[in-house]
């Protein structure tokens, strides 16, 4: 389609043609014919560099010129906002005004009301929606760039909520990379869909292996064996190359290595221009490496560089001065293997995106995608005491601790046994097998680790009141169920009620009409008395029916429709489908967990007490593997050890029952647990030995054997968000940036290391990297090459070149993001009650994709209870929400409610002892802060620092065994960085001392600045003490500028930062008054102070002062080298 044929304003055509564009690309033409120019929503999913931005510009400008109003262009990153702002400024020739906004989440930015095109990050626009900026009602179009990030764990929920808010209020144009389910996104947005793989530059894709380049069309080119030859070949052709690697250090190392080779291909003018570029970069440890690489026309690009440095590199690459950039882009199980998830154990082959699995940290993380491949050959069967055997591929890694048993004898005859531990470390299953078989020392054992989740659910009741109706043979009627009016609003959670629920899990069932039944033995009078007494206590209006049956069976029944529904929805129905909900399993109240365990044991357990010679034990049998794994975690959360045994019992010839899972507690745990649960405790026997024990926050499982087994079929793995591990009864590994085009893209790595090992990079990411190949206007063809170092080239071609990208999945259920969004809906968007909240959630992508919001509703209820309990919101007598000042301000400040709660809880301690270190550790402890990691060799130093500063902290130091211990030391390290910063420690020394890059420090300071501001704003709500408030304000100013207290007055002056302020202070200019009294020529003697700085200060202070020619500094004369340079 020709530009002249477009049904748009002629002025727009003129601007486009001035860019040299006379004809549109095919996908652009298809997009503009889709109805988007008439106001219809559109999802445009096409490759990088195929013209998505031009489509959005045409739609935006045409709509604004014809209808008025405003257009908002959403981007994921601040750097992209700046880039788009510069691009869109061109439209100001048509009278449109363009603005960009990315920071300061505590503002309505009313000044944006004067602008027509507003570029914003998603987070910034979300904050503007919360503040209720008056100009938002005028927004006629929202463009969501990179909308595929709706599947991002960290940022996806924000983007999804924005689009849900704006659906029906403004036209939506969603720009996306090619994804696996774009049609699903289009359906949700009620949008036309244009999907295309057309590119303006032909893309050749291939895999390089040991000097052979296998193209996707079957052709083979030959090069020297090292992949670097691909880079040099591109430069020799007068082209540029992008090299993607998997770590920052690799990017730096490869850039320096390539520099010495590429430098020989540069011209002398290029060398001189590179020297000028190098001289403009500030010195620090990271840029020292960058300068070494730049000498040869090569640069590295990663998040450790400052924004200014990244921009400088990108501009020099676009201009052709930099030839090469190395950059970082931002194994398997048998199908019947059970993985521990938040809702119980599930087969790895049955897991789906969004399931939450237990990771090595003891927390549950989202599954991004399940992975599957064919396998023919060996599997290793790992058998460990305390868990069921697991079948695993030999190269799959497991987390292992080496345990060494020691024995000491004393003169009085006493014998003490103790253990030493080495690790943990990752090793392949094959390596573990070889170590196990070669180990000759009987004192050495190899232990697998099962994390013990920290109880994290703070709930003391179960909500019961709800409108439920009678169900008859024709379905639901409008007749309210009679039990509802007599149902208590909540069922308290305590030892008694948890015990009752435990009994129901073991021996209970429900009917659709609300009958709750317990099946017990007819000789269990004490149990009958407990069940009936507890029902009478908490359901006083319920009719209880006790009936004996043959074979010594007894049923206890009562009716409560709401409680029955809660049991079915949260626990399940049927012996093999039941699981323990997190509300109980992870409840912070130990009494709740103890009551639950007692009820389970009473219902379906067995306590062996009669033997003195043989080991006694507590046993629980179930056909539900999910329940078995959860029971082991429940026992472990109480500080005891247990084991799981699986057996298959047969009856008759050829008849096989389902596997039975027995969870056993024996040894010392047996006696202690019986006593704590309130059972009769027998006399201790001679045998209390147990091979398993707890260590730190893990259950240690001793490996007893590893056997081989032949297998042919599919094997599975998981990609986990923010982690590289998951639990199958013990921890296994899941073995599973830059926006510039270049002629040749080389992908050195298709795996990356995160936390504890390697994982395959998703297809979508690799294909986006490949999409950078080929520069429109400059190249007729682009080349994208994957390097196969140890991988099979054919498999890489099948996966990454011919494979389809992954599907997008809603990340709204991410608890941290969802918590903040629920608060915002209530306090800022006028959601009046829970029904309205559910109604809004039903319009989200999550609801559209899953067709059901029940799990989201359950989470929302938990969050609402949390918000009420912590005084963010309240409810009136009609169950309508009331937004409280604390909640409204928290939402406006754009921080997690958990962060706000931490601040509020700390206010009394801050008033007693305001100090920088305690406040900085508080900031670092919040979920909104990016904290540093304390490496193993540093842990002792930071623990010593914590004890030294203990009286200044606002929280206690966790024990070594506590799962929070390592994270706490990271918080201490982060607080120490901030303390050094405000004490004017030079940046270079901070980078070196803490082994961080400038980009890391910038990110920490930016977040700390915002959190410090939020702390002050929230403190104002709670009758603040003026002296404490002033202290916090001064500390905030010190944090923002990185200065000691004596420089506060100076840094308030324009363009006076930490270095210039210190230079002025040391030169004797210690206050504004000193500066006003000084002569300009004296100020000009201070390092870093120039004429423009002085003039700016005078203007700021309202002083009219003209600097004479004599007072102006004389220009320094240069030499010949300066002139030539």
UniProtKB/Swiss-Prot annotation:
SMART domains: DEXDc, HhH1, HintC. CDD domains: DEXHc_archSki2 (cd18028), Hint (cd00081). ATP binds at residues 28, 46-53. Pfam families: DEAD (PF00270), Helicase_dom4_arc (PF21280), HHH_5 (PF14520), LAGLIDADG_3 (PF14528). InterPro entries: DEAD/DEAH_box_helicase_dom, Hel308-like_dom4, Hel308_SKI2-like, Helicase_ATP-bd, Helicase_Hel308, Hint_dom_C, Hint_dom_sf, Hlx-hairpin-Hlx_DNA-bd_motif. Its EC number is 5.6.2.4, 3.1.-.-. PROSITE patterns: HELICASE_ATP_BIND_1, HELICASE_CTER, INTEIN_C_TER, INTEIN_ENDONUCLEASE, INTEIN_N_TER, Q_MOTIF. Disruption phenotype: Not essential, it can be disrupted. Slightly more sensitive to UV and mitomycin C than wild-type cells. The keyword Hydrolase applies. Residues 500-640 form the DOD-type homing endonuclease domain. Residues 226-440 form the Helicase C-terminal domain. GO terms for biological process: DNA repair; intein-mediated protein splicing; intron homing. Belongs to the helicase family. Hel308 subfamily. Monomer. This is ATP-dependent DNA helicase Hel308.
């Amino acid at each position: 389609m020709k530009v002249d044929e477009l049904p748009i304003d002629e002025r727009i055509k003129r601007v486009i043609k001035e860019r040299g564009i006379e004809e549109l690309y095919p996908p652009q033409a298809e997009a503009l014919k889709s109805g988007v120019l008439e106001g219809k929503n559109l999802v445009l999913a096409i490759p990088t560099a195929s013209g998505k931005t031009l489509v959005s510009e045409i739609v935006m400008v045409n709509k604004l010129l014809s209808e008025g109003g405003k257009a908002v262009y959403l981007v994921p990153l601040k750097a992209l906002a700046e880039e788009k702002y510069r691009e869109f400024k061109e439209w100001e020739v048509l009278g449109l005004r363009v603005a960009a906004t990315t920071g300061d989440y505590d503002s309505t930015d009313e000044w944006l009301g004067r602008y027509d095109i507003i570029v914003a990050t998603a987070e910034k626009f979300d904050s503007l929606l919360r503040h209720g900026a008056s100009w938002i009602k005028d927004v006629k179009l929202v463009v969501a760039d990179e909308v595929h990030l709706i599947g991002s764990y960290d940022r996806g929920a924000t983007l999804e909520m924005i689009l849900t808010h704006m659906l029906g209020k403004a036209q939506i144009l969603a720009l996306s990379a090619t994804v696996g389910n774009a049609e699903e996104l289009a359906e949700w947005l009620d949008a036309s869909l244009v999907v295309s793989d057309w590119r303006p530059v032909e893309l050749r894709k291939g895999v390089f292996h040991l000097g052979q380049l296998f193209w996707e069309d079957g052709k083979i080119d030959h090069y020297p064996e090292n992949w670097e030859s691909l880079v040099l070949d591109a430069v020799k052709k007068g082209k540029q190359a992008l090299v993607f690697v998997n770590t920052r250090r690799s990017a730096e190392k490869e850039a320096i290595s390539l520099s010495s080779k590429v430098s020989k291909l540069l011209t002398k003018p290029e060398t001189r221009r590179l020297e000028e570029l190098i001289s403009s970069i500030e010195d620090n440890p990271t840029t020292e490496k960058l300068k070494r690489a730049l000498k040869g026309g090569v640069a590295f690009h990663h998040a450790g560089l400052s924004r200014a440095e990244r921009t400088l590199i990108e501009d020099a690459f676009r201009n052709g001065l930099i030839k090469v950039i190395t950059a970082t882009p931002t194994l398997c199980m048998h199908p019947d293997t059970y993985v521990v998830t938040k809702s119980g154990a599930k087969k790895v082959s049955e897991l789906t995106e969004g399931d939450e699995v237990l990771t090595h940290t003891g927390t549950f993380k989202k599954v991004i995608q399940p992975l599957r491949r064919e396998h023919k050959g060996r599997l290793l069967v790992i058998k460990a005491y305390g868990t069921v055997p697991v079948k695993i591929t030999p190269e799959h890694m497991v987390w292992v601790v080496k345990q060494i048993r020691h024995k000491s004898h004393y003169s009085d005859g006493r014998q003490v046994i103790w253990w030493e531990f080495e690790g943990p470390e990752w090793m392949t299953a094959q390596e573990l097998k070889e170590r196990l078989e070669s180990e000759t020392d009987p004192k050495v054992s190899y232990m697998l680790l099962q994390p013990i989740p920290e109880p994290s659910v703070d709930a003391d009741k179960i909500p019961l009141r709800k409108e439920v109706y009678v169900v008859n043979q024709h379905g639901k009627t409008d007749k309210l169920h009679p039990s509802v009016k007599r149902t208590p609003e909540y069922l308290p959670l305590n030892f008694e009620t948890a015990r009752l629920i435990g009994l129901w899990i073991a021996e209970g069932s429900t009917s659709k009409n609300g009958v709750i039944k317990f099946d017990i033995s007819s000789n269990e009078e004490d149990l009958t008395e407990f069940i009936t007494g507890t029902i009478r206590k908490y359901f006083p209006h319920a009719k209880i029916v006790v009936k004996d049956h043959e074979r010594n069976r007894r049923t206890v029944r009562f009716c409560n429709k709401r409680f029955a529904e809660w049991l079915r929805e949260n626990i399940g129905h049927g012996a093999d489908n039941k699981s323990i909900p997190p509300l109980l399993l992870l409840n912070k109240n130990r009494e709740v967990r103890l009551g639950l365990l007692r009820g389970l044991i009473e219902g379906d357990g067995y306590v062996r007490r009669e033997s003195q010679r043989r080991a006694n034990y507590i046993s629980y049998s179930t056909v539900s593997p999910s329940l078995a794994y959860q029971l082991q975690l429940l026992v472990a959360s109480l500080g005891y050890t247990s084991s799981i045994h699986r057996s298959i019992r047969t009856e008759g010839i050829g008849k096989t029952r389902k596997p039975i899972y027995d969870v056993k507690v024996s040894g010392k745990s047996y006696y202690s647990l019986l006593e704590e649960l309130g059972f009769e405790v027998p006399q201790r026997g001679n045998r209390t030995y147990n091979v398993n024990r707890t260590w730190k926050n893990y259950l240690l499982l001793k490996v007893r054997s590893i056997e081989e087994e032949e297998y042919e079929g599919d094997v599975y793995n998981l990609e986990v968000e923010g982690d590289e591990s998951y639990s199958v009864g013990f921890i296994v590994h899941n073995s599973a940036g830059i926006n510039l085009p270049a002629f040749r893209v080389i992908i050195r790595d298709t795996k990356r290391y995160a936390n504890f090992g390697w994982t395959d990079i998703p297809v979508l990411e690799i294909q986006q990297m490949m999409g950078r190949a080929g520069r429109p206007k400059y190249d007729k063809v682009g080349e994208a090459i994957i390097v196969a170092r140890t991988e099979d080239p054919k498999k890489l071609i099948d996966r990454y070149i011919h494979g389809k990208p992954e599907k997008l999945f809603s990340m709204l259920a991410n608890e941290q993001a969802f918590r903040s969004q629920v608060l915002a809906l209530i306090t800022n968007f006028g959601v009046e009650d829970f029904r309205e909240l559910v109604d809004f959630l039903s319009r989200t992508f999550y609801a559209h994709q899953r067709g059901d919001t029940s799990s989201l509703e359950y989470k929302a209820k938990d969050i609402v209870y949390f918000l009420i309990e912590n005084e963010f919101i309240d409810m009136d007598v009609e169950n309508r929400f009331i937004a409280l000042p604390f909640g409204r301000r928290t939402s406006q400040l754009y921080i997690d409610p958990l962060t706000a709660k931490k601040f509020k809880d700390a206010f009394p301690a801050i008033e007693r002892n305001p100090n920088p270190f305690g406040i900085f550790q508080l900031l670092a402890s919040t979920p909104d802060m990016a904290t540093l990691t304390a490496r193993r060799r540093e842990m002792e130093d930071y623990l010593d620092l914590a004890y030294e500063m203990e009286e200044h902290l606002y929280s206690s130091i966790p024990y070594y065994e506590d799962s929070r211990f390592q994270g706490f030391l990271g918080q201490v390290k982060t607080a120490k960085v901030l303390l050094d910063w405000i004490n004017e420690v030079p940046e270079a020394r901070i980078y070196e001392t803490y082994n961080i890059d400038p980009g890391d420090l910038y990110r920490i300071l930016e977040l700390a600045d915002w959190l410090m501001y939020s702390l002050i704003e929230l403190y104002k709500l709670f009758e603040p003490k003026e002296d404490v408030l002033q202290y916090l304000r001064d500390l905030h100013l010190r944090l923002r500028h990185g200065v000691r207290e004596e420089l506060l007055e100076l840094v308030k002056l324009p363009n006076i930062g930490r270095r210039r302020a210190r230079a002025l202070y040391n030169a004797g200019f210690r206050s504004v008054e000193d500066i006003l009294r000084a002569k300009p020529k004296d100020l000009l003697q201070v390092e870093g102070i120039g004429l423009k700085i002085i003039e700016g200060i005078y203007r700021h202070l309202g002083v009219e002062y003209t600097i004479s020619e004599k007072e102006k500094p004389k220009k320094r004369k240069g030499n010949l080298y300066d002139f030539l340079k």
